[in-house]
From Swiss-Prot:
Subcellular location: Cell inner membrane
TM ranges: 2-22, 34-54, 68-90
Stated name of the protein: Putative 4-amino-4-deoxy-L-arabinose-phosphoundecaprenol flippase subunit ArnF
Keyword Lipid biosynthesis: yes
GO terms (BP aspect): lipid A biosynthetic process; lipopolysaccharide biosynthetic process
Cellular component annotations (GO), alphabetically ordered: plasma membrane
Pathway given in the UniProt record: Bacterial outer membrane biogenesis; lipopolysaccharide biosynthesis
Subunit architecture: Heterodimer of ArnE and ArnF.
Primary residence: membrane
Domain of life from the UniProt record: Bacteria
Keyword Cell membrane: yes
Coiled-coil region: none
Family named by the database record: Belongs to the ArnF family.
Amino acid sequence: MGVMWGLISVAIASLAQLSLGFSMMRLPSIAHPLAFIAGLGAFTTATLALFAGLAGYLIPVSCWQKTLHSLALSKTYALLSLSYVLVRVVTRSVRRFLSKSDARRIVHCGGDNADFPARQLMMACASTAAIRRRNNIEH
């Protein structure tokens, strides 16, 4: 029963971490506090993802409490590390999926609006790819 609670906690914590990453990529930078607060007040998808991610970190606490009552601490830490692996695998899979899809069609859906998330994501991926190419050439 403890393993089940641990796996539930891992799933919720992983989703929370992905949700927080999603929201932070779309909200204004924290370096500009007034813009960030205004972004929070807009109640966009990014704001909801931020609050869901924060709640997602609180919920697993009760799951871990139930897990620790029935499992040894060494096994519990192994379950906890599974969350980091899961987030990494999902993130890499999404990047590969987006790189194999027709990028022009995704970007075109946003039209000329630079605030469209797909356009921002594609611009970030393109700049990351350019940096990687430049670093490979330099080395």
